[in-house]
């Protein structure tokens, strides 16, 4: 903000910062190899991709909307309305229209509790290689494709989570520097 909202100056600040230049590797790999030859301790953790369900759950957690309740009946989360209202053929007839759970506490539970309906896939989760409900899946495919980035930029679910995240930050903090610090902590999981 001090530099007149210049993106070029922001990029320079980020790319020349000590934090950006740090490595995710352990500073003394030899001693770590002696103490933990099988790599079972928490001293080392190689970065990995999040799977579709983890991405949705992380967005709900950051926005403050995640219901952490464990167990219970399956929930019906929000999905793209164009897909929800699409007629589906089941056993020679037409299935009823998909309706998400009416209360946010119900539909914002972890994705592992989401009801899976054959013939109806959530486009957001599908973009990130969630296996279909039609067949068993021994190993997930991992891909990096343009629709993933476009989904994170344009999906209605992502925009709703971003608005809820902004509302959470404004509710918790008073000034701009506190908001930015808290946003950084929450978005990177350091809270």
Residue ranges of model-derived segments:
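Beta-strand segments within the central parallel beta-sheet cores of soluble alpha/beta enzyme folds
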Residues: 9-16
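An acidic, gly/pro-interrupted, aromatic-rich
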Residues: 1, 8, 21-187, 191
């Amino acid at each position: 903000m001090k530099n007149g909202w210049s993106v070029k100056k922001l990029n320079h600040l980020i790319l020349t910062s000590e934090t950006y230049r740090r490595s995710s590797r352990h500073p003394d790999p030899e001693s770590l190899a002696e103490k933990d030859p099988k790599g079972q301790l928490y001293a080392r953790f190689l970065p990995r991709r999040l799977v579709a369900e983890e991405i949705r759950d992380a967005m709900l957690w950051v926005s403050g909307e995640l219901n952490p309740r464990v167990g219970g009946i399956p929930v019906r989360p929000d999905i793209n309305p164009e897909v929800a209202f699409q007629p589906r053929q089941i056993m020679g007839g037409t299935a009823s229209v998909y309706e998400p759970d009416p209360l946010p506490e119900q539909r914002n539970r972890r994705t592992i509790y989401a009801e899976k309906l054959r013939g109806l896939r959530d486009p957001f989760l599908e973009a990130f290689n969630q296996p279909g409900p039609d067949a068993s899946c021994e190993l997930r495919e991992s891909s990096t494709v343009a629709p993933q980035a476009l989904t994170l930029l344009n999906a209605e679910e992502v925009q709703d989570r971003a608005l809820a995240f902004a509302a959470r930050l404004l509710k918790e903090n008073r000034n701009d520097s506190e908001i930015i610090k808290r946003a950084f902590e929450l978005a990177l999981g350091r809270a």
